[in-house]
């Protein structure tokens, strides 16, 4: 029998207890010292039989099971084990087999109790402080945290970008966001503007567009430029828009024309590509016409007549004078010198459907059609000129007499169509004619309806004549058999320019670049586009809309569009307004005709009264004239009756026009 006390006496380190310390867990191994106490393990110096060794191994394994509860609570400890402790005990076969029944198990039981107490205290600490335990996060939680961090970083970046952009632009005016969007869009454009060296293409109908620079008033209001001219035939309008959720964006509309001139183009460049090719036509026996069309204040008079300084004008830098100089240059060339051509000029205006001569104290003229269906302007005088300087004098004289008025866009706006004609005559016979027309500013009916009756009548007549002009040019371009030139006085006077094989026309559409004129600019471009109907990408449409959105939010709105019902109601009111204007114009003409008849056939009562003032007047003569006057008076009763009916109808038409105008103004105020 081996006594355990003897073994302990020989190897005291086998039963020596050490303090516990937590450490990383290791896999359980047999023949290792118990995990809850730190003790040195050495090989026993007392040999024993194999049964005793197996009994000890079993006993040690039993004690090692105390570690399991501690592992479940994530508190792991490890006792350092010497290298020798992992080796098996040496077994001496010469000794008898020891018995394990007499070995006392008190130290092992004490070790087991301490391990259980330690495990119990660990469980209590974990349950009392659940936050101290380290828990692994799931993959979903980690991904959500990553997304949150990315969103915060993106917001911070956007905030920095907004602050930087706000520093680059002046926030004192409300349209700086649109200015930034337009600037960013222009950076992406490939610009190839028109140059003087570009070839000149000849067209029977040439439609061009010219953009003027921002004027002093627009710069003072801090307006932005919404027009871009990326190429020699393409023009873009950056129309500001506002969504329902107050998101601002641009609708970029493209228009294609034969030539597009930006704000840097001079009058000389515009003339080179527009009116200059037409000068050759009149020397070949043809008729040529050049129009300047556009909104009030868009630069029509500057282009046609020259530089303006208040009401004075430098006519030498306008298309009128440039065309005159080229006419005299061609006239003196050898190929045309033998024709013995003489140059004449006329200058008249059409105001409110009436024709007035600008070179003869604004004498009123009549437009009639003779038996050969040729339109004649009765009383219009032609002035012979021998050089370009004479022409410039005539232009200055006529421009000073032109009818003008004040509008919302121009304090000195031309309210009439001015027509300057250069005629070539050979032995009194008309050889060619070049008509240069400075059209009145186009107005919306809704804008003119709020003014007085005179201004409303001006606007109605201007729009009527411009519509007739557009249809006449389209008929010329499409070679239609019928040309609606009788629709207005303007097309009547220019009738011979729309018929015949050798007729050419050029239209210069003038536009304003400011954001406040965007709607009027689009109306001008659509008018010019329908004259010829070119597509920006060789398609059937003349417009292409490309939207560029930005996430800028603002409560200010550029403008609200009308609903379908409101547009229909306003359209019906405008139709009534235009019908009333047409009736007024027709009745006015009838009243003038009746009055002329009465004046021509009626007696001169003033002459009879003056006759009686003479001391030696002939009484017989007086009686004869009085009887004749009374007879004529009876015959003219029907003319008086007709005039009375016309005046009543004219009064009714004026009342209808006034009522329609008030309805339109009321509708505009409610909007």
Curated annotation (Swiss-Prot):
Residues 153-184 are annotated as: Negative regulator of microtubule-binding. Residues 37-58, 115-138, 533-568 are annotated as: Disordered. Residues 1-200 are annotated as: Globular. The modification Phosphoserine is found at residues 41, 55, 57, 61, 112, 121, 133, 138, 465, 576. Keywords: ATP-binding, Cell cycle, Cell division, Centromere, Chromosome, Chromosome partition, Coiled coil, Cytoplasm, Cytoskeleton, Kinetochore, Microtubule, Mitosis, Nucleotide-binding, Nucleus, Phosphoprotein, Ubl conjugation. Residues 204-534 form the Kinesin motor domain. Residues 566-601 form a coiled coil. Pfam families: Kinesin. It is found in: Cytoplasm, Cytoskeleton; Nucleus; Chromosome, Centromere; Chromosome, Centromere, Kinetochore. GO terms for biological process: attachment of mitotic spindle microtubules to kinetochore; cell division; establishment or maintenance of microtubule cytoskeleton polarity; metaphase chromosome alignment; microtubule depolymerization; microtubule-based movement; mitotic metaphase chromosome alignment; postsynaptic cytoskeleton organization. SUPFAM superfamilies: P-loop containing nucleoside triphosphate hydrolases. GO terms for cellular component: centrosome; chromosome, centromeric region; cytoplasm; glutamatergic synapse; kinesin complex; kinetochore; microtubule; microtubule plus-end. Testis. Localized to the meiotically active cells of the seminiferous epithelia in the testis. Phosphorylation by AURKB, regulates association with centromeres and kinetochores and the microtubule depolymerization activity. ATP binds at residues 210, 294-301. The keyword Signal does not apply. The keyword Cytoplasm applies. The microtubule tip localization signal (MtLS) motif; mediates interaction with MAPRE1 and targeting to the growing microtubule plus ends. In complex with KIF18B, constitutes the major microtubule plus-end depolymerizing activity in mitotic cells. Regulates the turnover of microtubules at the kinetochore and functions in chromosome segregation during mitosis. Plays a role in chromosome congression and is required for the lateral to end-on conversion of the chromosome-microtubule attachment. This is Kinesin-like protein KIF2C. It comes from Rattus norvegicus. The gene is Kif2c.
């Amino acid at each position: 029998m081996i006594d355990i006390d003897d073994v302990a006496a020989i190897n005291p380190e086998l039963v020596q207890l050490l303090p516990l310390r937590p450490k990383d867990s290791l896999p359980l191994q047999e023949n290792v010292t118990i995990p809850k106490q730190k003790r040195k393990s050495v090989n026993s110096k007392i040999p024993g039989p194999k049964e005793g060794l197996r009994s000890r191994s079993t006993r040690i394994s039993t004690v090692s099971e105390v570690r399991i509860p501690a592992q479940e609570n994530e508190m792991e400890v490890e006792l350092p084990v010497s290298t020798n402790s992992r080796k098996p005990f040496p077994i001496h076969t010469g000794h008898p087999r020891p018995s394990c029944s007499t070995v006392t198990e008190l130290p092992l039981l004490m070790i087991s109790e301490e391990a259980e107490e330690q495990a119990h205290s660990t469980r209590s600490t974990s349950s009392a402080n659940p936050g101290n335990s380290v828990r692994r996060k799931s993959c979903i939680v980690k991904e959500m945290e990553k997304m949150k961090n990315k969103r915060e970083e993106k917001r911070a970046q956007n905030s920095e970008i907004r602050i930087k952009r706000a520093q680059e632009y002046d926030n004192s005016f409300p349209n700086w966001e649109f200015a930034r969007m337009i600037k960013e869009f222009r950076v992406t454009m490939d610009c190839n503007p028109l140059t003087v060296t570009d070839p000149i293409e000849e067209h029977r109908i040439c439609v061009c567009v010219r953009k003027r620079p921002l004027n002093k008033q627009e710069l003072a209001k801090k307006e932005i430029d919404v027009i871009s001219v990326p190429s020699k035939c393409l023009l873009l309008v950056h129309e500001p828009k506002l969504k329902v959720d107050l998101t601002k964006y641009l609708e970029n509309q493209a228009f294609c024309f034969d030539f597009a001139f930006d704000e840097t183009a001079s009058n000389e460049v515009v003339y080179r590509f527009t009116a200059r090719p037409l000068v050759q036509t009149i020397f070949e026996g043809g008729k040529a016409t050049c129009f300047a069309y556009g909104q009030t204040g868009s630069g029509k008079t500057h282009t046609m007549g020259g530089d303006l300084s208040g009401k004075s004008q430098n006519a030498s830098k306008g298309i009128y004078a440039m065309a005159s100089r080229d006419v005299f240059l061609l006239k003196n060339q050898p190929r045309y010198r033998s024709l013995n051509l003489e140059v004449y000029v006329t200058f008249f205006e059409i105001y409110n459907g009436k024709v007035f001569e600008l070179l003869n104290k604004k004498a009123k003229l009549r437009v009639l059609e003779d038996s050969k269906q040729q339109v004649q302007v009765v009383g219009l005088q032609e002035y012979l000129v021998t050089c370009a300087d004479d022409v410039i004098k005539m232009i200055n004289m006529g421009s000073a007499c032109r009818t003008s008025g004040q509008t919302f866009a121009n304090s000195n706006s031309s309210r009439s169509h001015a027509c300057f004609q250069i005629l070539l005559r050979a032995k009194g016979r008309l050889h060619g004619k070049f008509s240069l027309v400075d059209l009145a500013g186009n107005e919306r009916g809704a804008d003119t309806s709020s003014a007085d009756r005179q201004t409303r009548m001006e606007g109605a007549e201007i729009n009527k004549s411009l519509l007739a002009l557009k249809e006449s040019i389209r008929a010329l371009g499409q070679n239609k058999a019928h040309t609606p030139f009788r629709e207005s006085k303007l097309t009547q006077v220019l009738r011979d320019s729309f018929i015949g094989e050798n007729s050419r026309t050029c239209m210069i559409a003038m536009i304003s670049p400011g954001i406040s004129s965007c709607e009027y600019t689009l109306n001008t471009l659509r008018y010019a586009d329908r004259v010829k109907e070119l597509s920006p990408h060789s398609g059937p449409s003349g417009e292409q809309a490309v939207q560029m959105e930005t996430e800028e939010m603002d409560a200010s709105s550029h403008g609200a569009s009308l609903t379908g019902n409101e547009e229909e109601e306003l359209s019906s009111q405008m139709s009534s307004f235009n019908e009333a204007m047409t009736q007024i114009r027709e009745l006015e003409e009838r009243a003038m005709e009746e009055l002329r008849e009465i004046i021509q056939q009626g007696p001169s009562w003033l002459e009879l009264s003056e006759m009686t003032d003479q001391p030696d007047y002939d009484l017989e003569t007086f009686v004869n004239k009085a009887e004749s006057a009374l007879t004529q008076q009876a015959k003219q009763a029907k003319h008086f009756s007709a005039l009375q009916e016309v005046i009543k109808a004219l009064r009714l038409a004026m009342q209808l026009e006034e009522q329609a105008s008030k309805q339109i103004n009321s509708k505009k105020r409610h909007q």
